[in-house]
Amino acid sequence: MGLTSQLLPPLFFLLACAGNFAHGHNCHIALREIIETLNSLTEQKTLCTKLTITDILAASKNTTEKETFCRAATVLRQFYSHHEKDTRCLGASAQQFHRHKQLIRFLKRLDRNLWGLAGLNSCPVKEASQSTLEDFLERLKTIMREKYSKCSS
């Protein structure tokens, strides 16, 4: 049984509407998860949050939103890959060790979600100014909250 020509336009319309709804809904969910992760990260005070990271957010005037997300994910990946086993971050106590492992887990989650929003395979990151991880995450949280308010309106 084939589709009649009368049914095709309404079906395409329904598919287009469903796609737009799903895209907006996914944007909403992804941003909410990123903001929740950033909230958890900025509440944590670990030895690693005082270390420096390449601050791509300070020099993001001529970049697209997707490039900014891609570069943020890239510098976060560089940071947690380099500091995952850093003795300055691990601390001496079991509690400090646990906090560090939790920080790395949250950074990996944030990296994954930013890559999903960026939708790019790779992006170059030039050496820029440095800031603490804590300041970088606060600025990223502000950007994500602004995007969330635009996405949900």
Curated annotation (Swiss-Prot):
Gene3D superfamilies: 1.20.1250.10. Glycans are attached at residue 62. It is found in: Secreted. SUPFAM superfamilies: 4-helical cytokines. One of its GO terms (cellular component) is extracellular space. One of its GO terms (molecular function) is interleukin-4 receptor binding. Its main location: secreted. The keyword Glycoprotein applies. Belongs to the IL-4/IL-13 family. Participates in at least several B-cell activation processes as well as of other cell types. It is a costimulator of DNA-synthesis. It induces the expression of class II MHC molecules on resting B-cells. It enhances both secretion and cell surface expression of IgE and IgG1. It also regulates the expression of the low affinity Fc receptor for IgE (CD23) on both lymphocytes and monocytes. Positively regulates IL31RA expression in macrophages. Stimulates autophagy in dendritic cells by interfering with mTORC1 signaling and through the induction of RUFY4. This is Interleukin-4. It comes from Cercocebus atys (Sooty mangabey). The lineage of its organism: Eukaryota, Metazoa, Chordata, Craniata, Vertebrata. The gene is IL4.
